[in-house]
Amino acid sequence: MAKLAAFDMDGTLLMPDHRLGEQTLTALKRLRERNITLTFATGRHVLEMHHVIGEFSLDAFLITGNGTRIHSLEGEELYRQDLAPEAAEAVLHSKWDTQASMHVFNDGGWFTGQARPELLKAHAFSGFHYQLCDPKRMPAHHVTKICFCGDHDDLRRLRIQLNETLGDRAFLCFSAMDCLEVLPVGCNKGAALAVLSQHLGFTLQECMAFGDAMNDREMLGSVGRGFIMGNAMPQLKAELPHLQVIGDCRHQAVSHFLTHWLDNPDLPYSPE
């Protein structure tokens, strides 16, 4: 029996309309009744996630900003890592050949230079909102991450530019087909989960994890049992072909698996 369960949010626990379904909530609460520790491992900001776990009365550790922050059940910061200031400076002040919008995150929130109301749909359930400002005027110190949102092919070309400029000063990954993230070196959900597991006295082999995107790769590949969503990015399935693929987030597939696992732990699982 696993001791720690880690869940990505968008495309995994959340349905396509970015809501947490009732079946999913029931399954999570059943895990807690079995004394299984929960952690939500997400690219979302900790300010938003505190609202989410408060609204649904969920006791969970938080890995936020794609591994840049870890918070305890009580909201205490257990770990933090920011982009190297020179890397943040380079991203903020370079001229990029892209149509993608730039978004900057720090402990104060989410900042962008142009209104993108379509991006707020993913945050409607929490009310989390960007703040408009000129990114070039933002201090390069204490930047958690920077992300670019736009067309996938455009972002692939941008990734080449960013790699050429940043080299090994940052870690780049796609958290969705339309979102490219610039993160601190060595920062990912898997590394953060290793820190949290050690803090709790667990091994990664005693963890299970669920995800759908390339920012879940390290986490899914490092735990005792990793599960890929049926709606996952093709690149993730190709990178981790040995992991079991479950159903689609639109059908609350995580809850379907967990219910089976809790009721029939010794029987093989099929998403059908």
UniProtKB/Swiss-Prot annotation:
This is HMP-PP phosphatase. Its cofactor is Mg(2+). CDD domains: HAD_Pase. One of its GO terms (molecular function) is 4-amino-5-hydroxymethyl-2-methylpyrimidine diphosphatase activity. It is an enzyme of class 3 (hydrolase). Keywords: Hydrolase, Magnesium, Metal-binding. It comes from the Bacteria. Mg(2+) binds at D8, D10, D212. Catalyzes the hydrolysis of 4-amino-2-methyl-5-hydroxymethylpyrimidine pyrophosphate (HMP-PP) to 4-amino-2-methyl-5-hydroxymethylpyrimidine phosphate (HMP-P). It comes from Klebsiella pneumoniae (strain 342). Its EC number is 3.6.1.-.
